[in-house]
Amino acid sequence: MENTQENPATPSAEDIGSEKQAAQGAAPAAEAADAALAEAQAKVAELQESFLRAKAETENVRRRAQDDVSKAHKFAIESFAEHLLPVLDSLEAAVSDTSGDIAKVREGVELTLRQLTSALEKGRVVAINPVGEKFDPHQHQAISMVPAEQEPNTVVTVLQKGYMIADRVLRPALVTVAQSK
């Protein structure tokens, strides 16, 4: 009996030809895939480098901003202190005065008070002196209520001035307020 079936393990000539053709067709595809992979890897490396540079730049900007804020806090009072130095000079001159002339001392104290008021205003510190104004619990602290001719809840007297810097109350004014009739 003769074996007419071909051995499946032995490839035929057609199979060998088609495998060579497939291998030859696969070679350009593999080369194209390798080129695409290399291009993608180069792009990834480029993007990683760009990311690291952007991250470093962001860190530098953040650090510079922190330094600027730190310097602003550190030297914010410098201008205010410069405006107070003439007041200090005037007070030292008053203390060292031995003339005993009360009128001269009073005049010096008034001048010093004007210098101090000017220095505070240059630092945007303004007095709250609300006589005759409506009572405002954000700016005033009522010490007492008194019978008065003014409209109820109106400031009658200021016992101690308050002070504001910009729109913030540093110290509320101590006031007496008109009582309801």
Curated annotation (Swiss-Prot):
Give any Pfam family that matches: GrpE
Q: Where in the cell is it found?
A: Cytoplasm
The terms describing its cellular component in GO are: cytosol
**Taxonomic superkingdom:** Bacteria
Q: What's a single GO BP term from this record? A: protein folding
Keyword Transmembrane helix assigned: no
Molecular function GO labels: adenyl-nucleotide exchange factor activity; protein homodimerization activity; protein-folding chaperone binding; unfolded protein binding
Q: Does the keyword Chaperone apply?
A: yes
Disulfide bonding pattern of the chain: none
Regarding protein family, the annotation reads:
Belongs to the GrpE family.
- Role: Participates actively in the response to hyperosmotic and heat shock by preventing the aggregation of stress-denatured proteins, in association with DnaK and GrpE. It is the nucleotide exchange factor for DnaK and may function as a thermosensor. Unfolded proteins bind initially to DnaJ; upon interaction with the DnaJ-bound protein, DnaK hydrolyzes its bound ATP, resulting in the formation of a stable complex. GrpE releases ADP from DnaK; ATP binding to DnaK triggers the release of the substrate protein, thus completing the reaction cycle.
User: What is said about its interaction partners and assembly?
Assistant: Homodimer.
Q: What is this protein called?
A: Protein GrpE
Lineage start: Bacteria, Pseudomonadati, Pseudomonadota, Betaproteobacteria, Burkholderiales
